């Protein structure tokens, strides 16, 4: 599956700014794993108050980097 197909099939249904729960569902991992990735900088994010938000563009960058490694 190429990068464009990932975007069209997986991430197209999600909003441009995603919650931890939405990010978790998109990646197929637990929210605990997403929190770890956000805290250690694996996925770029922004904090709104006490909540993390993940711009879809940052999630796409993460996926692109990891697809290149695979």
Residue positions per predicted region:
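Basic Lys/Arg-rich amphipathic helical interaction modules
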Residues: 1-36, 56-70
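Short Lys/Arg-enriched helix C-cap and helix-to-coil transition segments
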Residues: 46-52
């Amino acid at each position: 599956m190429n990068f464009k197909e990932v975007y069209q099939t997986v991430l197209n249904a999600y909003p441009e700014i995603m919650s931890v729960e939405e990010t978790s569902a998109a990646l197929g991992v637990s929210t605990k794993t997403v929190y770890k990735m956000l805290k250690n900088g694996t996925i770029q994010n922004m904090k709104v108050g006490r909540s993390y938000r993940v711009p879809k563009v940052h999630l796409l960058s993460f996926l692109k980097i990891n697809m290149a490694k695979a």
